[in-house]
Amino acid sequence: MEDQEALGFEHMGLDPRLLQAVTDLGWSRPTLIQEKAIPLALEGKDLLARARTGSGKTAAYAIPMLQSLLHKKATGPVMEQAVRGLVLVPTKELARQAQAMIQQLAAYCARDVRVANVSAAEDSASQRAVLMEKPDVVVGTPSRVLSHLQQNTLKLRDSLELLVVDEADLLFSFGFEDELKSLLCHLPRIYQAFLMSATFNEDVQTLKELVLHNPVTLKLQESQLPGPDQLQQFQVVCETEEDKFLLLYALLKLSLIRGKALLFVNTLERGYRLRLFLEQFSIPSCVLNGELPLRSRCHIISQFNQGLYDCVIATDAEILGPQVKGKRRGRGSKGNKASDPESGVARGIDFHHVSAVLNFDLPPTAEAYVHRAGRTARANNPGIVLTFVLPAEQPFLGKIEDLLSGEGEAPILLPYQFQMEEIESFRYRCRDAMRSVTKQAIREARLKEIKEELLHSEKLKTYFEDNPRDLQLLRHDLPLHPAVVKPHLGHVPDYLVPAALRGLVHPRKKRRKVPFSRKAKKVKAQNPLRDFKHRGKKPKPAAKPS
């Protein structure tokens, strides 16, 4: 069986409109999970599928769902319009991403298949209006879907045909166990179901018993991460916390890390400390903060994917899961007080063309490491993962490596050959910058950013809908400036650059401009001093000869 030629999309009996959409997306052949799952799903079987992050799981369930809907509408008797597909995801960002992927695949059959996302940050009245039109597929988090079911704005008992639970191993970690059990009471007795997951844990086994009926289990024989020819993984030992900041400064300021980078930390406070530290050296970055409005978070991801930012600082949403297992993380709980329990970044969110993942803080579990590393080296693109580790953390990192590589296999985390003495000349700069980033400065920065983002998200929502181009002018990496910024730190004199790197490195340039040609003209037109043009006095007409 393994020697047989791989099954292509054109051999799966798909609707021509779906094949055209797949072609437009540039997919020449299915991934392993798509090749195995789509034919089984088209046969009407329940699926429990495990595949690593970035392997194409969304399309693996979206394509058979759309194919089933199109086939029944084309060949069966005329059916009453109703919701026939339900996709449950753990976070609002994943809901937006799943909706976008389904809509891309349904680009040539948009009149026949409509998709609605009920997890968006909209008022319930507008969502009720959307649900009254009975879209074919509804995407949402369990809490939002259950809310609509209880209000009778969404009815599934007589119409649902296909249920998808995406990132199944995260649902219980996000506190959705009770909601999910209540939601299942509103579904019909018979329906086809898919459970898609990156890991098989106890939560997935519980979900399997609740949702699936005689499922086919797909455990793909693939590593959790791409091979070393595509993904390079390194560790660098930093003797002190100060060394971590010093090394990060050198890597970014001297452009030793090229392309877009994701910086992972373990807490939001660490994220803002890191951002304010980088700000001292004119290195722009954004913090993907669950306290911010959903529109702001999605806008940050969108602009990062467009290449507007090179650095985004993020935390693991699932790190909080085991600590609050079985109950929703409340707004009054310790930690990120106002954070959205349905916001998350480490799993599933699709960041485009990430060149490097830097684990500034050591991930707490092997699973968290896999989810972080899965943000790069996607879709056959190369990537690098660099993990900063303190001496006291090395035994724990060794355990993570053993779980990833298996017993008796070669280590996958290679030592990063970096001579720290070469960048000692930068240490006094980093020490000054770290001293400026106090706890008070971090609190002020978080408060300032939340206030600004709330203003952008709520007060200007209608304006941006009417003027979408102006939304491009909204930046998320502008300086917060609660710390005392010294302008000279943004410049790197040649004598400070290590001798081995002189002439080879290119210090990071200034903030990238918005790719909007009218911006300069618009700013100039709004400034009367810059817009003023002095033409001088007109010369007096020459006197007529008498």
From Swiss-Prot:
It catalyses: ATP + H2O = ADP + phosphate + H(+). It is found in: Nucleus, Nucleolus. Disulfide bonds: none annotated. Residues 325-334, 508-524, 532-546 have a biased composition (Basic residues). It comes from Mus musculus (Mouse). This is Probable ATP-dependent RNA helicase DDX56. ATP binds at residues 51-58. A motif (DEAD box) lies at residues 166-169. The gene is Ddx56. One of its GO terms (biological process) is defense response to virus. InterPro entries: DEAD/DEAH_box_helicase_dom, DEAD_box_RNA_helicase, Helicase_ATP-bd, Helicase_C-like, P-loop_NTPase, RNA_helicase_DEAD_Q_motif. Residues 324-344, 508-546 are annotated as: Disordered. A motif (Q motif) lies at residues 7-35.
